[in-house]
Structure formats: structure tokens, C-alpha cells
């Protein structure tokens, strides 16, 4: 019998990677069809290699993508399909609004230097990747009733890609794209300050493109400070190490900064050591602005309920706190104000809360 969900009500998810949310069966299908060698020939076997049960370092985790991304990247049909199936997956998890992120360049094989995953050069550009993902998400939204929007990722080790990423954010604003992100290895010294990234974020500010940044996951509070002060981020991806700098944390609390928290992910990537108190407990106790998210459910062999079960069982989270954090997630979403209001109304109704509960940002 399936486990009863820890929070069986509509949910909002803001931090999840498309390329970390692919069905194993879909990877196998395109691997076979395209003649690309995979480390196993069954879904279960594939999960045993790609999936994680115990903590690894972040670089070891990132190496997991090398196993399966060649089966998907560069294939138009596969890219549209993974976006469509992603929405179906979220519908089953009780998500009513999701922002899914990905790097257009890491799914392309043309007009990208270097070409990723040892692919031969083809004719699928980052521009067309964004169009295909948008189509898949829109068809998924129509068929499964989950509102789905996308965030385009710059990669820390490829600042030369970033100017194109912000241009694609502008071009596809009407086709699901709502924001820009900076992802990848944040331990690369000074990577937040590389001119390609800084210029892309300056252009995003100028053009009214929303901004989030992976910072303080395994990097220091200094990386968080750079994300806030230099890249002008509106949300923090993870942000756990903000707590190393109490003055910074207090400032961000006052500014109502939103933390995109991924509890199960933080355990498996070693971003959080289980013998220490998880940052999310402090955020809960302070009634701060944060959400719960899966990050990369394929690799973490998880669903959103995994994160809710973990916080309920191990950290004393209550139904009331789950409601509060989802309302904060909706308020901190990158939707236009009218659509945000509709989403909040849906949540208030489902949670049996009066709409006047929206008074006060942190409820």
C-alpha cells in the first residue's frame, strides 16, 4: 500500500531541474533508439547506477549526468517529451504550480561551444531547445492541469554562454520562461563575478527578467552575498550556508529573501551534515520565507513527498507550517501579479484559510 502523503494538499515547487527529473524508461527508450550506450538496460538497473542512496560529494553527484544525458541531448523529440512527462510527474505529486529549470546549452548540439556530453555537432541550437521545452510544458499543462513555467540556467564554468541565456529569457517570456538562474559548481573561485554572468544578470535587471542563483549550497556565505549584492538575485537556490554569517542572514530575513530549500538533496550531496541542525529548522523557527523542493528527483530516487516526509518525521514540521511555506512559495514565485493572486486564492481555498490571511508577507 502506498504511503500516505505527509501533506496531501496542493503544493508549489520552485527548485527542480528538468534534466534531473527524467523517467528512467524514457532514457532507455532514446538510448536504444539512438544507439547510445547506457550503463544498464532496465529501468531498475539504470536507477542503481544513476540513483543515490547515501551521500556523495557534489562533483560525484554532478558526474551522474554523464551516464544518461547523451541519450537525451540533441534529440528534439526526447527534449519535448521529457518536459511533457515532467508535468505529468508533478501532477501525481499534488503540485499545482511548478517552476522547472535547465540549461538550454546542455541539451543542444549546435551553436554551443564546447558541445556537451561528447556529442557530434548537430543542428539543435539552445534557442530551439527552449522552444521545444516550452511546447512540452504547455501541452503538459493542458493535459494534466498543472501550471508549469521554466527558468533558464547559466552555468558557472561557462560564462560565455550566459549572454545568450538572458537573450533567450527575453525571447521566450511568453512561452513559459519566467527567470534566469546560475547553476553548476559554486566552489569555482570567483565564479559569481565572471563578467559573462555579471553582464547577463545586469541585462536581466534592466529587462525585468526575474533572477535566482544557486548559492550557499556547498559554497560559503560569501557566495550568497555575491548573489544578492552583485547579481541582484530575488531568491536563493539552497542558501544553507547563509547561516554562517548571522549579519547577512538577519539582513536577508528583513528583506524577506526566499530560500529554495531541498532537504533530501542536501543530505545526499553532503551540503548538510546530519550531525548538525539543518538550516531549514532555523528558517522554520524564525518563520522565514522558504519552500520545499526536490532538486533532482531522478538521481535522488525521490518525489516531493520524500522532502515533506523527511521534515515532518525528523524535524517536527506541522500541517500549518506546510501551508505557510507553500503560501510563501506562491508569493515568491515568478508569476505575474494577476496569476500569482489566482494561485494564492487556489491555495487559500484548498487550505481552508480566509483570503485575508494574505495580510503580512510571511504568513
From Swiss-Prot:
Look up what happens after changing residue 20 to R: In ADASCID; loss of activity
Where in the cell? Cell membrane; Cell junction; Cytoplasmic vesicle lumen; Cytoplasm
Return one GO MF term: 2'-deoxyadenosine deaminase activity
Q: List the disulfide bonds.
A: none
Q: What is its EC number?
A: 3.5.4.4
Specify the protein's topology with respect to the membrane.
Peripheral membrane protein
Q: What is the effect of changing residue 61 to A?
A: Decreases enzyme activity by reducing maximum velocity; reduces ADORA1 modulation
The record's section on SUPFAM superfamilies has: Metallo-dependent hydrolases
Which cofactors? Answer: Zn(2+)
| Cellular component terms per the entry's GO annotation | anchoring junction; cell surface; cytoplasmic vesicle lumen; cytosol; external side of plasma membrane; lysosome; membrane; plasma membrane
Site (Important for interaction with adenosine receptors and increasing their affinity for agonists): which residue positions? 58, 62
Outcome of mutating residue 177 to M: In ADASCID; loss of activity
* Outcome following mutation: residue 60 to A: Moderately reduces enzyme activity; reduces ADORA1 and ADORA2A modulation
Q: How is the cofactor bound?
A: Binds 1 zinc ion per subunit.
Effect on the protein upon substituting residue 211 to C: In ADASCID; late onset; 4% of activity
Q: List N6-acetyllysine occurrences by residue.
A: 54, 232
Could you tell me which InterPro entries the record lists for this protein? A/AMP_deam_AS, A_deaminase, A_deaminase_dom, Ado/ade_deaminase, Metal_Hydrolase
Q: What is the effect of changing residue 62 to A?
A: Decreases enzyme activity by reducing substrate affinity and maximum velocity; abolishes ADORA1 and ADORA2A modulator function
Q: Which family does it belong to?
A: Belongs to the metallo-dependent hydrolases superfamily. Adenosine and AMP deaminases family.
Q: How does it assemble?
A: Interacts with DPP4 (via extracellular domain). Interacts with PLG (via Kringle 4 domain); the interaction stimulates PLG activation when in complex with DPP4.
Q: What is this protein called?
A: Adenosine deaminase
Q: Which organism is it from?
A: Homo sapiens
